Structures are given as C-alpha cells and as structure tokens.
C-alpha cells in the first residue's frame, strides 16, 4: 500500500510539473466581488502581462448556474474579436472529476462603461462616436454567429482609459439555429429592465431577434449622451410610460406584436402621445448621431437596423468600412447540443472539463487520442493559489494594501509547464510582419498644421482627478490602429486545437514561434486530422483579414519613439480632430492613451 501511494505521488508530481500552471500567475489584489466569485488582478509571469483572474466557486451547486458558466466560456472561446473580452487561460482544476471551483484568466480591463459615464462629464463627440462604433462592430460579429447577447448594459461593457470597449458577460446569451423554433421560454431572462426592448416588456414567452440587442445599444448610447439612463422604469408600466413619452404612442400594428397581453391592453388604452424631437431631448448631440439613435430606438423591431446596416450609417462616414468589419461563421448545433436536452451535473462537469482542455493543448491532444489520465491529481500550485485568493478576500476590506501570500516552496511544482503558447518562459514572443498596417512613408506625406498643434499644446490643461477617459484612439481605414508596442493579437475563433494550427497563425492571442513547411503527404495527413475536429473550418487562415498583430516594435525602442509613432497615426486620422493629435504630441508621454488618474479596480465581475 505504501509503495502504491509513493508511486501515485510520484505520478502526480510528474504530471503536475508538466501541466500545472497556477504558479504562472502572481496575484496582486481584489478588484471585484460578486455572489458567485471574486476577481483579482495578477501578473502573468510568463509574459509579464497584467491579467484579471476570476474565481468562480461552487459552480455545480445549481445546475442552471453551471450551465450559464459553460455557455459563457464556450461562447468566449468561439467569439474571438477585439471588441469582445478575451479568455486568455483557464487553470487546470485539482481533479477533473471532483473540482468545484474554476479560475478563468481574462485580459485586464480598468473599468466598465457604467463607471466611465459616472466619472466623465467632459466626453467629446469623438468619444461618443468611437464608443458606438465599437459596440456595433462587436454586435455585427456576434449576430453573424447567430448569437444574441440579451443582457447588454453599461456594466457589461468593459473599458480602458484609451477608450477601448469590450463586451462581456455572455451568461444569458443564446445561439439561434435556422432549423429550430425561435420561440423560447424566458424563465432565466432577468436582464435589467431599463435596457430591455419594448416587445419583451412583461413577456416571458416570446420570439427573439437581433433587434433586442440593437434596442439595448440604443439605450446605452443615449445614456452616454445624457450621462444618465434613458428609461429608468420602476416597473413594466412605468417603463412603457417612459418609452412612449419620448417615442410617442406606437401604432396599433406595432402594439399587436407585443407578446404580453396586459402590456398590449395598456398600450391600446393609452392616450395619444406625440413623439419628442431627439434634438430637444439631446440638445448638444451631433445631428447625425441622433438620426441613427432614432433608428436604433424604433418601437417596432422591424424598423430597427441590423448592426451592419447601422455601421453603414452616415454618422460613421470616414470611420467604418462595413465590408472590412469582421464577421463570424455561424456556430454549429453540436457546440450547444447540451441546451436541447436534459443534462445532469456530471454532464455539465464533463463539458466544462472539455472546455478547460481547450487552453491546454497537450492535454487536449491526449484526451482526443484517448490517452488522458483523468484520475491524476495535481494539488500543489492550485491549492496555493486558492490560499492566495482566500487571504486577499479576508483582508480586502481592511485599511492599507494587502500583500499576497508568497510560495513557501518555490521548487514545487517545477516551472517547466506547458501553456497554450509557444513562448519560452522569460522570453519574448517573436513578431509577425503585418501587411495591413499604416505605411509610415505615406503618413509623413499627409498635410499637417504644426502651428495649430503647437497652439493646441499651449491650451491643453491637466485632466481632472476624477476623469477616466483619455482622447479617442487613432484609426486606420475604419479599424483601430493598434499601438506599435501593444503585445496583443487577435484572430477570429476556430475549433482547431491550438497545437494543430498553422505555425504562422495566431492562437489565443499569442504567436507561434515560426513557420514550418510540410511535405505534400504530411500536409494531407494534417488536413485529414483537421477535418476530424472541425470539418467546416478553412485550414489556411494566414490571409484572415481579421488578424490584428503587433507591429513596429523595432521602431519603438523608447518612449520618444513611441510618441512619434502614435503622433504619425493621429496625423493620418480623418475626423478625429486636431485636439486628439495635440494630445499625442504633447510632452510627457503618449498623452492620447491616458489623461488623468486611472481608477484601478472595478466593481464589475468579468
């Protein structure tokens, strides 16, 4: 017995030293708490990148909560887009068949749109335009995958000080399939009433379309313009009153499409109300933005534009090029087969385990080959990580900074771990050549009024201490121009295991080490193996127009060089304005990225 235990311990240690990865992250501080978990900021010691780690505890206590977690991590794996929050990693649990908690690693975002609206009373028209552009671009991508978010609100939109927005919280999202009924029972639809489309008011049994998300985006944009919610209804009746006060009484034909009988009767008996002109409701807004907002907030869902149609609106002229905005292949029914049958906790546990393996390519390969050792335990680093979270949770409310616990035995487990990236520990990822970035030579030839910039620099004042947002980031042909020193890369999702993607593609936001060439026979075998995993996915994605790679690192070796690059990008921007360019050229760093104090920490759970 003792020999068997010793052998088991040796196997566990060997297994964990190969695949365990909790020691990869150094926990910093608690940045958010909720009923189902806690979020801490951390440092990825492999890349030096700041991340947010969300601990979700007791995920199998209620099967509905477990299904929601599975749905979200699955959708965030499939929906890879720069305007959607990215899961970078999911840690291996101590036991694949007995775990209760999971640790999900996200890219770190500094705040959310709700806090941005509260803290900034000096947002410009460029901010408003850029915010709506990002939200519609993300929504176009989501809807082309046949996914409806269903819970869009400012707290579910993460934000950075460089004006970057990312949609998060897909726990209430649903995937629509063409051969299945579009009518569902909305028992779990508890989205905030203020952003809920009128056709859903008081309705729990309804057909849903992408128009419900479009309405939510309209409410969010109006809140950005006003600085407060547009329809803060206290109940369903009050909500309908607020809507009709602004939009006027809907036609009888429109009322007939409201599913709830009581709401339908109330609207029918309502006195005739004329609509209020949006120019009167939003006196300082761009007239073009108000014309688009009227379309987004059409009472009848048939009159609302799609996200793609909204991006083609004149409001985004010179900013968005609809044909270049990313789209997504529709999600297959097999991915969400669990939604259409009765599942047990063990079924959900197995499906979540399978999702976790997507972030551990070697284990995934073993699992697909039937050689995975599911009964092995790997306790050391995960247990230490759990203690770090508990320590920070217990002390987060006390005065003064809380120092995270350090490892007492740094040698266990060893640092030779396998990750979802080919970057060596302590090394830097190699760069890709990006053929879609701005040409510095053409940038230098753009007419630029330096006298105006100097005058603007003299008039620049320090940001207020409570201000969060800096000037709007630059663009390149309708896409966000990424900083030359930004280490992130993005690619639309595929279902291929990371270890089997082409060496020149980007996997989970990281670059592979180098390109390899394959002989025809080997390539045929590789394609056959691809088809086993994802027969409908194109193999060669080298020319994917949605890849956004880091570029220009060799040209930006110091702070001044970075400022020059950012200023050149601003010079090439049409419609962003001289003030933003002045901020970029101002002394003291790349001012267009951050102005004023950034509030570190957030109440929003990822």
Curated annotation (Swiss-Prot):
Keyword check for RNA-binding: no
Enzyme Commission (EC) number: 2.7.11.24
Protein modification: Dually phosphorylated on Thr-187 and Tyr-189, which activates the enzyme.
SUPFAM superfamilies, per database record: Protein kinase-like (PK-like)
PROSITE patterns xref list: MAPK, PROTEIN_KINASE_ATP, PROTEIN_KINASE_DOM
Domain Protein kinase span(s) in chain numbering: 25-316
SMART domains the record matches: S_TKc (SM00220)
Residues the record marks as active site: 151
Inhibition and activation profile: Activated by threonine and tyrosine phosphorylation.
Keyword Zinc-finger: no
Ranges spanned by the short sequence motif TXY, renumbered to the chain: 187-189
PTM sites of type Phosphotyrosine: 189
Catalytic activity: L-seryl-[protein] + ATP = O-phospho-L-seryl-[protein] + ADP + H(+); L-threonyl-[protein] + ATP = O-phospho-L-threonyl-[protein] + ADP + H(+)
Residue list for modification Phosphothreonine: 187, 192
Domain of life: Eukaryota
A Pfam family annotated for this UniProt entry: Pkinase
Annotated PANTHER family: MITOGEN-ACTIVATED PROTEIN KINASE
Family listed: Belongs to the protein kinase superfamily. CMGC Ser/Thr protein kinase family. MAP kinase subfamily.
Protein name: Mitogen-activated protein kinase 20
Source organism of this protein record: Arabidopsis thaliana
């Amino acid at each position: 017995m003792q020999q068997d235990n010793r052998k088991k311990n040796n196997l566990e240690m060997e297994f964990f030293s190969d695949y365990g990865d909790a020691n990869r992250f150094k926990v910093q501080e608690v940045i958010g708490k909720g009923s189902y978990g806690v979020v801490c900021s951390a440092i990825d010691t492999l890349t030096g990148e700041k991340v947010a780690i969300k601990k979700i505890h007791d995920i199998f206590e209620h099967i509905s909560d477990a299904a929601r977690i599975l749905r979200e991590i699955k959708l965030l794996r499939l929906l890879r887009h720069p305007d959607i929050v990215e899961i970078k990693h999911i840690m291996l649990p101590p036991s694949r068949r007995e775990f209760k908690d999971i640790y999900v690693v996200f890219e770190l975002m500094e705040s959310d749109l709700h806090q941005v609206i509260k803290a900034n009373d000096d947002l410009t028209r460029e901010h408003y335009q850029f915010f709506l552009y990002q939200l519609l671009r993300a929504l176009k991508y989501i809807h082309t995958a046949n996914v409806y978010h269903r819970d869009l609100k400012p707290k579910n939109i993460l934000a950075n000080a460089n004006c970057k927005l990312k949609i998060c919280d897909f726990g209430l999202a649903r995937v629509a399939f063409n051969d299945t009924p579009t009518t569902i029972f909305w028992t779990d639809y508890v989205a905030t009433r203020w952003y809920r489309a009128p056709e859903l008011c008081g309705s729990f049994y309804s057909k849903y379309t992408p128009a419900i998300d479009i309405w939510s985006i309209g409410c969010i944009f109006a809140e950005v313009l006003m600085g407060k919610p547009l329809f803060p209804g206290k109940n369903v009746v009050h909500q309908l009153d607020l809507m009709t006060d602004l939009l006027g009484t809907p036609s009888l034909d429109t009322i007939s499409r409201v599913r709830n009988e009581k709401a339908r009767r109330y609207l029918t008996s309502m006195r005739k109300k004329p609509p209020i002109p949006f120019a009167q409701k939003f006196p300082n807004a761009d007239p073009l933005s108000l014309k688009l907002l009227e379309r987004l907030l059409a009472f009848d869902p048939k009159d609302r534009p799609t996200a793609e149609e909204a991006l083609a609106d004149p409001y985004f002229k010179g900013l968005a090029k609809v044909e270049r905005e990313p789209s997504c292949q529709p999600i297959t029914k097999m991915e969400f087969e669990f939604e259409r049958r009765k599942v047990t906790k063990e079924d959900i546990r197995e499906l979540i385990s399978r999702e976790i393996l997507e972030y551990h390519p070697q284990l995934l390969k073993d699992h697909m080959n039937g050689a995975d050792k599911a009964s092995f335990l790997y306790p050391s680093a995960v247990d230490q990580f759990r203690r770090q979270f508990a320590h920070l949770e217990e002390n987060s409310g006390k005065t003064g900074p809380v120092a995270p616990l350090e490892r007492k035995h740094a040698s266990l487990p060893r640092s030779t771990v396998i990750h979802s990236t080919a970057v060596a520990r302590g090394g830097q990822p190699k760069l890709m050549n990006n053929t879609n970035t701005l040409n510095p030579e053409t940038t230098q030839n753009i007419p630029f009024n330096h006298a105006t910039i100097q005058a603007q620099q003299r008039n620049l004042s320090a940001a207020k201490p409570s201000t969060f947002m800096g000037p709007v980031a630059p663009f390149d042909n309708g896409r966000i121009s990424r900083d030359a020193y930004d280490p992130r890369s993005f690619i639309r999702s595929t279902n291929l295991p990371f270890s089997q993607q082409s060496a020149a593609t980007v996997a989970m936001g990281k670059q592979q080490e180098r390109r390899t060439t394959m002989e025809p026979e080997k390539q045929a075998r590789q394609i056959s193996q691809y088809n086993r995993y994802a027969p409908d996915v194109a193999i060669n994605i080298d020319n994917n127009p949605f890849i956004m790679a880091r570029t220009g690192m060799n040209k930006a070796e110091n702070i001044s060089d970075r400022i020059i690059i950012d200023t050149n990008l601003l010079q090439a921007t049409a419609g962003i304005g001289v003030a933003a360019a002045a901020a970029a050229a101002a002394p003291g760093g790349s001012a267009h990225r951050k102005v004023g104090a950034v509030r570190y920490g957030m109440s929003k759970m990822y």
